[in-house]
Amino acid sequence: PDYLQLARA
């Protein structure tokens, strides 16, 4: 999964 995008949730 995209961790960078998950951190922006």
UniProtKB/Swiss-Prot annotation:
| GO annotation (BP), single | neuropeptide signaling pathway
Q: Which GO terms describe its cellular component?
A: extracellular region
Source domain of life:
Eukaryota
- Determine if Secreted is one of this entry's keywords: yes
Report the subcellular localization.
Secreted
Q: What is its main location?
A: secreted
Key words, A-Z: Neuropeptide, Secreted
**Entry function:** FMRFamides and FMRFamide-like peptides are neuropeptides.
Family in the record: Belongs to the FARP (FMRF amide related peptide) family.
Q: What is this protein called?
A: Extended FMRFamide-2
Q: Which organism is it from?
A: Austrophasma gansbaaiense (Gladiator)
What are the top taxonomic ranks of the organism? Answer: Eukaryota, Metazoa, Ecdysozoa, Arthropoda, Hexapoda
